[in-house]
């Protein structure tokens, strides 16, 4: 959603801002806008179905498999990413003026986007904290652990909504009244010039801290600690785990480090640059590049946290084969698989005789011998233990 800086609020009876073009968009701003649209289109096209499949598989498997704290955190991460991707088409079309809306609709879209992004980053930090507790064996098993996890997730979403509350307060509809183009409407976040170095700067710094610096510090601290703990394990297990952790950490830093740098530069520009057409175009171009970066996590998280794991791939195969849609069928197959693992399966004799036929023949032989006054034959010997 674009950020507009204005000198006065010109609203009509529909509470829409009317804006006449005074600053011509620069070439860099046009290129940045086209790049943002292309990247977001790719994220929606690929990340949307991927997050939907991962979330559906995770929710179906939660019905048949035991649910743990990491599983609930993963489910919440996929849900937050899917909701973020769901808001992108409206924001893309609104920025291009291809879809109209009301001020209330723009406020809801702004709240949904910033809240779901914040919840996604917070869930990543919860996953890192949970793994730290598992290493130190500080987790508690019991009936209360699941309730505590749900309480933590509820607090996370409530805090995300509170952190995202400034966005809908300043979101509104802007009506473009250009003389050489057709009139259209877009959703914007509007700040007057006297709010640039106060409200807008605070908003930029808050996003930089919550979406950028805090996740980088938390993830870096945990995985450095996790790498040190790997030295106590065997070489084979250490090499396999280290490969996964390195991939996870590098992917996160490759996405987050440019975001922190761009947002820091953007915050510096808001505080120090003068307000004129050149700096406004430059600031808008930097903001467009910055707001694309968090959306990349919606594309990477399903791959890193789901498809790189063996357990999820097995459950995904069960899901696409239809075995997870019936909870009773899934539990029956799991019980049958457990019986095969616990009890050894002995080879059948060369003559194929079912158990019911063998029992019926033996009963008939016993009744015939008793009628003749002869003792019944001894029971057959048990099968050898190493069958």
UniProtKB/Swiss-Prot annotation:
Its main location: host cell. Residues 368-387 are annotated as: Disordered. Residues 1-33, 95-107, 170-204, 269-285 are extracellular. Keywords: G-protein coupled receptor, Glycoprotein, Host cell membrane, Host membrane, Membrane, Receptor, Transducer, Transmembrane, Transmembrane helix. One of its GO terms (cellular component) is membrane. InterPro entries: CCR1-9-like, GPCR_Rhodpsn, GPCR_Rhodpsn_7TM. The chain crosses the membrane at residues 34-61, 72-94, 108-129, 151-169, 205-224, 245-268, 286-309. Glycans are attached at residue 20. Residues 62-71, 130-150, 225-244, 310-387 are cytoplasmic. It comes from the Viruses. One of its GO terms (molecular function) is C-C chemokine binding. Gene3D superfamilies: Rhodopsin 7-helix transmembrane proteins (1.20.1070.10). Residues 374-387 have a biased composition (Pro residues). GO terms for biological process: calcium-mediated signaling; cell chemotaxis; immune response; positive regulation of cytosolic calcium ion concentration. PROSITE patterns: G_PROTEIN_RECEP_F1_1 (PS00237), G_PROTEIN_RECEP_F1_2 (PS50262). The keyword Membrane applies. Plays an important role in vivo, in particular in the dissemination to or replication in the salivary gland. This is G-protein coupled receptor homolog R33. It comes from Rat cytomegalovirus (strain Maastricht).
